[in-house]
Amino acid sequence: MDRLVRFTFRHFLANPWFTKLLSTENVENARFLKLLPDIPALHSPLVGQIRTILERGHAAGVFRRDVDPIQLYISIAALGYFYVSNMATLSVIFEKDLSSVSMVQEREAQAVQMVIDYLKTKPA
């Protein structure tokens, strides 16, 4: 799970154009995405891998059982997407350079920890 969160975070960081593309496509109500064939099939293997990781973690007594792999993927993606897509404005608001190596590393570590802590937390 650590590697998945880091990979996703780093993907958004290394490809800032992707956040712009997603933002534009959402403004357009996924107009162009709807024209592409088999889009759901592209994410099925990823969701399956997440499901497998969750099952293994539960079997090992490490992860809680009630986590939906799609919801988890959305949360993981959100942690990277929001940071990258709002880096400029948040840097001004908080008077910190969120693009600096130290800030990026801190945010990535926090994203990983947030996901791991969520997966270990017993449901209410």
Please report, for each region that a protein language model flagged, where it lies by residue:
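Non-catalytic, well-ordered alpha-helical scaffold segments
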Residues: 16, 20, 70-77
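All-alpha amphipathic helical-bundle segments outside canonical DNA-binding/catalytic cores
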Residues: 35-42, 59-75
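Amphipathic alpha-helical linker/stalk segments
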Residues: 1-4, 34-40, 55
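Short amphipathic alpha-helical surface patches that mediate protein-protein
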Residues: 6, 24-27, 68, 77
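Amphipathic alpha-helical segments used for helix-helix packing
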Residues: 14-37, 87-94
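Active-site-adjacent scaffolding segments
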Residues: 1-7, 18-20
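C-terminal peripheral helix-coil segments that are non-catalytic and often amphipathic
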Residues: 7-10, 14, 44-60, 75-124
